[in-house]
């Protein structure tokens, strides 16, 4: 039955690896439609610091699932899977190929493998956890998570109360850890997926790209964009939107906790750390074809051949 399923392409990669450029070039050759797989690009008013595709790029290749939420709102992997599947089905109905582009690996994993059934939020238990945090501190609760679920504790920072609270809540409701429950796969993706990842061969080149992009963001007005968010008064640094790399560091600057130069340096370092995590995740990914950021033409040919060969096999 697999050959009857529609084709979908995944184009993954670390930040600043050239995913957007390659995706736009591919769309100019083939009937593909782009779906963003990025937990930062979903937010309106956060354009410069997320390196969101600009107006020209959006005209060349419109991206779905960009600018869909206000920065005050949360968005889960389950929300993404629902929205991405709906977009993929629309694209296939138009006789085109969904091309999913981004660097949020959790979203790709949720889409590909489905999501395990987690218990619904419990307001009473959540309130109890928050009260404990007020009296003991989040670091003590993180130590508790470390004892019951060291895998989740390694992924969740002590200063990330939303995710830390949820991990403890899940355990207290179900008696099972978040790690145990997420190992149970949900409904698989009803598509034939060809998966690609793009990155520079050398880490130093990726670091250079990250620093260059951050400098360009500052020149483009990232500080002004951040000030507009800061002065809204309905945002705070614990929101998922403001925890995005670059935004958290610039928020600290506006809060008076560091200088602008320190915020820029910390933002670049945080982006490098994000890229390292993305690459580590991709190296453990199955059925993945690697592409070279420094050879866009060859990468484009590899993607084109994958589409052409799939068409030939379906004839």
Swiss-Prot record:
It comes from Vibrio vulnificus (strain CMCP6). One of its GO terms (molecular function) is ATP binding. The record marks 104, 126 as: Interaction with substrate tRNA. Pfam families: IPPT. Its cofactor is Mg(2+). GO terms for biological process: tRNA modification. This is tRNA dimethylallyltransferase. Substrate binds at residues 15-20. Monomer. The lineage of its organism: Bacteria, Pseudomonadati, Pseudomonadota, Gammaproteobacteria, Vibrionales. Residues 38-41, 162-166, 243-248, 276-283 are annotated as: Interaction with substrate tRNA.
